[in-house]
Amino acid sequence: MKVSATAFAVLLMAAALCAPASASPYASDTTPCCFAYISRPLPRTHVQEYFYTSSKCSMAAVVFITRKNRQVCANPEKKWVREYINALELS
């Protein structure tokens, strides 16, 4: 019994560490915050809209919302992120 509980705890920790860079709620507030950025550009055709995270968040981020309604965190200082934002503003 102890072995299965330990194995479950290890799997739970591994799942938490392997989570993609996505937005998640900050404490009890519904403002999404990011704790990691996506490492490579998203396909531009997958992005529908975006928003900036709140100043309450520990790190600034742009959250892109994909066609499949996924929220993906990106570094607002990256060139591709700024280009996507400009393209979305013009469309």
Curated annotation (Swiss-Prot):
InterPro entries: Chemokine_b/g/d (IPR039809), Chemokine_CC_CS (IPR000827), Chemokine_IL8-like_dom (IPR001811), Interleukin_8-like_sf (IPR036048). The keyword Amino-acid biosynthesis does not apply. Its main location: secreted. PROSITE patterns: SMALL_CYTOKINES_CC. GO terms for molecular function: CCR chemokine receptor binding; CCR1 chemokine receptor binding; CCR5 chemokine receptor binding; chemoattractant activity; chemokine activity; chemokine receptor antagonist activity; phosphatidylinositol-4,5-bisphosphate phospholipase C activity; phospholipase activator activity. Keywords: Chemotaxis, Cytokine, Disulfide bond, Inflammatory response, Secreted, Signal. It comes from the Eukaryota. Residues 1-23 form the signal peptide. The keyword Membrane does not apply. Coiled coil: none annotated. GO terms for biological process: antimicrobial humoral immune response mediated by antimicrobial peptide; calcium ion transport; cell-cell signaling; cellular response to fibroblast growth factor stimulus; cellular response to interleukin-1; cellular response to tumor necrosis factor; cellular response to type II interferon; cellular response to virus. Chemoattractant for blood monocytes, memory T-helper cells and eosinophils. Causes the release of histamine from basophils and activates eosinophils. May activate several chemokine receptors including CCR1, CCR3, CCR4 and CCR5. May also be an agonist of the G protein-coupled receptor GPR75. Together with GPR75, may play a role in neuron survival through activation of a downstream signaling pathway involving the PI3, Akt and MAP kinases. By activating GPR75 may also play a role in insulin secretion by islet cells. Belongs to the intercrine beta (chemokine CC) family. PANTHER family: C-C MOTIF CHEMOKINE 5 (PTHR12015:SF170), SMALL INDUCIBLE CYTOKINE A (PTHR12015). This is C-C motif chemokine 5. It comes from Bos taurus (Bovine). The lineage of its organism: Eukaryota, Metazoa, Chordata, Craniata, Vertebrata. The gene is CCL5.
